[in-house]
Amino acid sequence: LTKIGDASFYYCSSLEEVDLLHTKVQELGENAFAHCTSLREMKVPDSLQTLGEAVFYRCSKLVPSDINVYDNKAIVAYLRSIQ
């Protein structure tokens, strides 16, 4: 698994946590987790390189401190999503 495609989990309201640490994911597509209103924890591997627009849009329970990251990319994507 190297990519989570565009809108893969769009409006998946029952999704509470995602752990990709044991994958080689390099890309999270546009709106991949948008409107996942129960998502509270997101763990990404250091292989992550690309984040599409609005990856975490309207993920109201997900806050930057809940994101386990090895670089700042997930936090930047989150901050762009909530604007």
Task: Give the role of each language-model region.
Residues 1-3, 13-27, 37-50, 60-83:
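Structural signature of tandem-repeat unit edges
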Residues 5-10, 29-32, 52-55:
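Consensus positions within tandem repeat domains that build extended binding/scaffold surfaces
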